[in-house]
Structures are given as C-alpha cells and as structure tokens.
C-alpha cells in the first residue's frame, strides 16, 4: 500500500518532465520563424524549412535515447534515470536561448542548435516511457487510469505554457527586440522547471514494483547483462504498443504540429480570406485548454468502464469524424475552425488519457521501462514525428485539403486493430507486480479476490507468469 501523499509527489515528479518537454515544443514551434531569421544563413521559406528540419532532428535521436536509457532504468532505477533526463532536457532548452546569432557565430550557430536538438531528442527518448512506468508502478490498481491521465495533463500544460509565453513575448516586443533578445526569454524558463523537476525526483524513492524486483534476487547484476535481449523477446507486446502509439501520436502531431500551418494553407487556397495568424494561435490555445480540462475525466472513466472501451471509442471517432472535422476547419471561420479542432482534440484525448496506464501494463516489471521506451520511440520517430512533413507534402502535391482526414482515418484503423490485441488491465496489478491498493479495507478485498482467481487458474493449469490474455480466457469461461 502506497501512501496518498507519496503518490501525489510521484505524479508531480513525473509530470514536470512532460511539462518541460512540451513547453519546449510549444516555444520552438511558435518561435520557429524568428529562430530561422536569427540563426540560419538562409532567408525566407528556406530558413523556416531548415528550422523545422532541426525540430525533426530530435525525433531521429529519440530511439537511441529509448534504447540506452530505457533498459538503464530497469537496471539502476526509474527515479535515477528520470533525474538524468530532466537535467539533459532542461539544460538543452536553456542552451538554445544562449546560442549566439549567425551574424556573430556564423555556421557554428546552426551547429549548436543542432546539438541542442540532439540532446533534447535523446533525453526525451528516455523520459516519457520511463515517466509512464514510474506513475503506473506507483498508482493503486483501481486508480491507475485517472492518475496516469495526469501525466498528459502535464503535456497539455507544457504546450499551453510554451504557447502562452511565446505569444506574450511577441506581443510585448518590437520586431527588432524580438530578433535581438526577446526570442531567447521563453527558453530560459526551462531553468526553474528543471530545478523543480530534479528536486521533486531526487526526493522520491524508487517505485514499489522496482524495489520489490530488486529484492527478489541477489543475482540482479548478472541478470541485467541479458536485459536488452529479454526486452526484445517482448516483440508481440511491442507491436501492440507501436500500433497504439501510431494512432495516438499521428493524431497528436496532426493537431499540434500541422494544423497551425495547414490553416495558413487553407487561407492561401481561399485567396487570402480566412482567420488571422493571431486567431490561428488563439484557436490552438483554446483547443488545448479544452482538452486539458477533459483529460482527467476520461482517465477517471477508464477506471470505471475499462481502457479498451475508451481507446476503441477514440479509434472510431477518428474514422467517423475525420472528414466532418476537416470540413469545419477548411471553412476557415473562427467558429468553424475551433469546432473542427475540438472534434479532433476529443479523438486525441481518448488516447492521451488512457495510454499512460495502458502501455506499461503490456510488459513485466523486469523489462517494462526498456521495452516501453524502445517501442514508443521507434514508432513515434518512424511514423508520427514526421506527420506534419508528409501530410504537408501530400496537400501541396495534390492540392487536396482532405489529406489530413485520410491520414487520421488510417490512424483510427490502426488503433482499432491494435486494441483488439490489447489485454484489459483495468483494476488489475501490473504484470509481474503485486497488487497495489490505497486503503487497508481495499487490500482485504483484493486478497480474497486473488485467492479465488488463483484457485481457478491453478485448476485450469495456467502458469503463474502467464500473460493477461491467457488468464482472461480461463476466467471468462468460469
């Protein structure tokens, strides 16, 4: 049984990394044009394109971070690696604000920006899967959906904070001030976020599941030598994880990364008539705020009706509502754009609210952080991080403004197929972990239920380390 105060601190410690990551994403996205003008030796659209290319660089290094830092978390502990990623992430973000402009540093300005993005990508590769694992292992079984959803509250909070700070600086600075020093200010806010994150993470012990695993064997150091091999033995679960990651994050980056530039494309197609750039930014902030408010409610619902049900609803919404949402967005009026983006956002948060509790349940404790980090980052880098790039290329090449809808439908189909193979983890212990409860009276009920289920499974000849699917099939027939 984990004390509620400890759980609250664990959630705060995990969420602060997400806030920092998405704060940087929001700031970099909003400041991309200015960064291109100041740091790149190119002009106009070429400088902007290069700036976005450097944004994509971070995705190329996320799998490397997942491969190295994920298994390291299974070896030395979740909280130690989370402290490391917090330092790297915040340090790289602050460093971007310190890069000299091209007029003073020449090509080295571009090189320094590249290196900062590499470090951000590497650290993020070890951050998110580990943070999901951290919260999932701390959370009581019957509240894991709600508490896991708070990790995504951190995501949307970070994006809103980054967008808001960038918009504030742009509003208060003249063009010359913005190009001289104003663009740097939002990046410096990552410094206090980093201090807070490291402090929170250093004050917590490791998760009960990891500590129990460590106590099981004096041969743990020897076992760690084959941990990466053992991790890849989980490839069926990693494929299910990858399918869910695609459905989730194609939608995520379609909304947060591509829609702002897509609205400008729609305006061009309509001969310059449509919402202003300022309203474009405001509409994104409104949608993020709406999603932020609803995410915990969906997480709470997933503890009542199951994760699979929520994920299935989100997948169906992508398939059925992709065209209606794009039709509203392409009308390009203030009300229609916000309505269309909110529809897309509601589809997104069916995944965002449930994935932090769903994905860790696919893997046993010994390889959980490693398998999750590797699968998550490989699939997000290969299929999701470039969503804006390939969607924009298809729209530009064909002139068809409905391409985002086609891609969202494909994402929904992938999600629907993946959820078919997803075991329901609602209210159950994580694979390889003891039951986690919040109160003593709950513990007595859990023990009674587990004894009854264990007797049924033993009678059916199901082994103790069998995956959920095998146990589910036996229990469903009884």
Q: What kind of region is each of these model predictions?
A:
Residues 29, 235-291, 383-388:
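Extracytoplasmic gate region of multi-pass secondary transporters
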Residues 32-64:
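Extracellular/periplasmic helix-loop-helix junction of adjacent transmembrane segments
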Residues 75-87, 304-316:
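Cytoplasmic membrane-interface "Motif A"-like loop-to-helix N-cap segments
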Residues 87-106, 316-332:
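C-terminal ends and interior cores of transmembrane alpha-helices
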Residues 365-397:
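A late C-terminal transmembrane helix in Major Facilitator Superfamily
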């Amino acid at each position: 049984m984990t004390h509620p105060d400890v759980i609250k601190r664990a959630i705060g410690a995990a969420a602060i990394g997400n806030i920092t990551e998405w704060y940087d994403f929001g700031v970099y996205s909003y400041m991309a044009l200015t960064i291109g003008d100041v740091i790149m030796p190119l002009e106009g659209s070429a400088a902007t394109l290069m700036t976005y290319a450097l944004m994509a660089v971070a995705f190329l290094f996320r799998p490397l971070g997942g491969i190295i830092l994920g298994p390291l978390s299974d070896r030395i502990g979740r909280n130690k690696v989370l402290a490391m990623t917090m330092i790297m992430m915040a340090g790289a973000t602050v460093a971007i604000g310190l890069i000299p402009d091209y007029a003073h540093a020449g090509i080295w300005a571009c090189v320094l920006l590249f290196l900062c993005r590499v470090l951000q990508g590497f650290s993020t590769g070890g951050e998110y899967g580990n943070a999901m694992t951290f919260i999932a292992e701390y959370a009581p079984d019957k509240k894991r959906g709600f508490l896991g959803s708070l990790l995504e509250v951190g995501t949307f909070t970070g994006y809103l904070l980054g967008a808001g700070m960038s918009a504030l600086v742009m509003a208060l600075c003249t063009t010359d001030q913005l190009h001289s020093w104003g663009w740097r200010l939002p990046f410096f806010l990552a410094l206090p976020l980093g201090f807070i994150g490291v402090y929170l993470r250093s004050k917590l012990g490791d998760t009960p599941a990891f500590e129990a695993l460590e106590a099981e064997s004096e041969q743990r150091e020897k076992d760690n030598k084959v941990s990466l091999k053992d991790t890849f033995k989980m490839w069926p679960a990693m494929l299910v994880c990858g399918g869910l990651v695609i459905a989730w994050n194609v939608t995520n980056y379609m909304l947060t990364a591509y829609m702002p530039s897509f609205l400008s494309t729609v305006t061009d197609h309509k001969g310059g008539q449509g919402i202003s750039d300022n309203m474009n930014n405001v509409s994104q902030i409104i949608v993020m705020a709406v999603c932020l408010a609803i995410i915990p409610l969906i997480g709470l619902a997933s503890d009542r009706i199951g994760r699979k049900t929520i994920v299935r609803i989100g997948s169906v919404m992508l398939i059925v509502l992709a065209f209606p949402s794009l039709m509203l967005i392409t009308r390009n009026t203030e009300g229609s754009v916000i309505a269309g983006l909110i529809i897309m956002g509601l589809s997104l948060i069916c995944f965002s609210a449930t994935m932090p509790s769903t994905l860790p349940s696919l893997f046993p404790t010994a390889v959980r952080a490693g398998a999750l980090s590797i699968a998550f980052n490989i699939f997000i880098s290969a299929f999701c991080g470039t969503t804006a790039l390939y969607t924009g290329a298809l729209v530009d090449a064909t002139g068809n403004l409905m391409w985002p809808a086609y891609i969202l439908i494909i994402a929904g189909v992938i999600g629907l197929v993946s959820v078919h193979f997803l075991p329901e983890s609602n209210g159950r212990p994580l694979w390889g972990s003891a039951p986690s409860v919040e109160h003593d009276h709950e513990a007595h009920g859990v023990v009674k239920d587990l004894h009854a289920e264990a007797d049924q499974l033993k009678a059916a000849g199901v082994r103790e380390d069998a995956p959920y699917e095998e146990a589910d099939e036996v229990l469903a027939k009884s």
